[in-house]
């Protein structure tokens, strides 16, 4: 399964091109900007929600709403975004992460709208962002945060995407996999720094990835460990290393009740 990321990015470019033909950027931007102060759509403060949980002594859990993945196939047959989001909210999640990629993760924009609409938690649009158009899409769908993957973006475009998100009131989670990507991530303004324990080019997973990068992390960054958190021992290992923010999907999606599994994992 070599270089999955390149395949995904090629499809993303085609998706954006097709979306622009259906709706022009000025129209989409106007809608996104108009929602900033509208009841129910105003940004909910993704970073703030994480920090509040951690300040209260809890883990800051970004709980994922994900039907499938390229490496594991369908994770949850009984996939009801509203029920999943409600369960997460009632069992201690700080935020949601909702997959909107259709072709590789069987996600959808409607899943983001439905999950966010069913609970008070802020939501991340989990997708492969390659164009400003997608940032405006994210806000028009209600997203409170976007994901920027260093491996997928050149530094100039990444900075532009971040600036656009911040102008719209959204937070930004920047994601790295290795030390070679850290410098680019640290040039951004966002304090939210995700470390993906899964290599997006091979889909191999190692929790050592987060631990190995910790010594290089500035103190003002909030480190989010992503992927491979499957049991309480994984959580303990990270929290013992002073990592208190987690993005977890598969372990929750495979459980009978995702929120109950969240509470068990982070008890």
UniProtKB/Swiss-Prot annotation:
| Pfam families recorded | IGPS
Q: Does the keyword Transcription regulation apply?
A: no
Metabolic or biological pathway, per its Swiss-Prot or TrEMBL entry: Amino-acid biosynthesis; L-tryptophan biosynthesis; L-tryptophan from chorismate: step 4/5
Q: Which UniProt keywords apply?
A: Amino-acid biosynthesis, Aromatic amino acid biosynthesis, Decarboxylase, Lyase, Tryptophan biosynthesis
* The EC number(s) this enzyme carries: 4.1.1.48
The record's section on InterPro entries has: Aldolase_TIM, Indole-3-glycerol_P_synth, Indole-3-glycerol_P_synth_dom, Indole-3-GlycerolPSynthase_CS, RibuloseP-bd_barrel
Example GO biological process = L-tryptophan biosynthetic process
Catalysed reaction, written as an equation: 1-(2-carboxyphenylamino)-1-deoxy-D-ribulose 5-phosphate + H(+) = (1S,2R)-1-C-(indol-3-yl)glycerol 3-phosphate + CO2 + H2O
Q: What is an example of a GO molecular function annotated in this UniProt entry?
A: phosphoribosylanthranilate isomerase activity
The residue range of the signal peptide is none
Regarding protein family, the annotation reads: Belongs to the TrpC family.
> Which HAMAP family does this one have?
IGPS_B
The name under which this protein is listed is: Indole-3-glycerol phosphate synthase
Species per Swiss-Prot/TrEMBL record: Cupriavidus pinatubonensis (strain JMP 134 / LMG 1197)
Q: What is the lineage of its organism?
A: Bacteria, Pseudomonadati, Pseudomonadota, Betaproteobacteria, Burkholderiales
As recorded in Swiss-Prot or TrEMBL, the protein's gene is named: trpC
